[in-house]
């Protein structure tokens, strides 16, 4: 004004559009506005978000209809979630993860660069990194895929219908065959290949025998 320049006003649809970001507090306030809009979009598309105030989903995530997201869940970028899934509470999905229809990722779980097949259950206290998990697999509480050997990230393959017992540690690379079973607390060494319908137990894991053809051990 003092230099003779004109001053113009800009009208915005709402006050939030004109928020300035000059401090860390301003940044947090603006991020909360954006997060709310992202969640509103998902809910309008048929996703149930139980508590939007305690749910964090990045903008480029894709989630199918009738999936339920429970509180204290963090879903980061580049993630695909199918229809009729259940995620959380207290779950963290990291980039590169794909979850097929009707799968479940429960409380205190972390999934990174992992694919979960249809109707697979990962319900309690587990970490899956760089895993390729088939359909109708049950992952027990406390299971870990130890994907990093200090130099490389390695992949764990778990085939359809497998049953991974609680507290199993799979030191990648590992292959678990179709409808195979790992015993609770088993430590499966790097490079192990468990045959279809095989049973592995112990520390280190040893293959006991193969099962007769059977249905999946869980409904």
Predicted region positions:
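Secondary-structure boundary/capping motif
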Residues: 4-6, 82-84, 178, 185
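Acidic, glycine-rich loop-and-beta core segments that form the ion-binding/anion-interacting portion
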Residues: 50-110
């Amino acid at each position: 004004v003092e230099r003779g320049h004109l001053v113009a006003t800009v009208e915005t649809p709402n006050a939030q559009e004109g928020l300035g970001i000059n401090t860390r507090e301003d940044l947090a306030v603006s991020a909360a506005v954006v997060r709310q809009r992202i969640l509103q979009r998902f809910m309008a598309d048929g996703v149930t978000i139980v508590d939007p105030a305690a749910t964090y989903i990045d903008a480029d995530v894709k989630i199918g209809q009738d999936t339920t997201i429970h509180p204290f869940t963090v879903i980061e970028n580049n993630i695909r979630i199918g229809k009729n899934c259940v995620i959380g509470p207290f779950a963290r999905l990291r980039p590169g993860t794909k979850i097929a229809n009707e799968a479940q990722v429960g409380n205190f779980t972390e999934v990174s660069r992992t694919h979960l097949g249809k109707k697979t259950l990962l319900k309690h206290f587990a970490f899956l990194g760089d895993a390729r998990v088939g359909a109708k697999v049950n992952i027990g509480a406390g299971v870990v895929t130890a994907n990093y050997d200090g130099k490389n990230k390695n992949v764990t393959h778990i085939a359809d219908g497998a049953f991974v017992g609680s507290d199993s540690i799979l030191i990648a690379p590992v292959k678990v065959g179709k409808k195979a079973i790992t015993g609770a607390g088993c430590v499966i060494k790097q490079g192990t290949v468990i045959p279809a319908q095989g049973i592995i137990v112990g520390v280190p894991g040893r293959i006991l025998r193969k099962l007769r053809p059977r249905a999946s051990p869980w409904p």
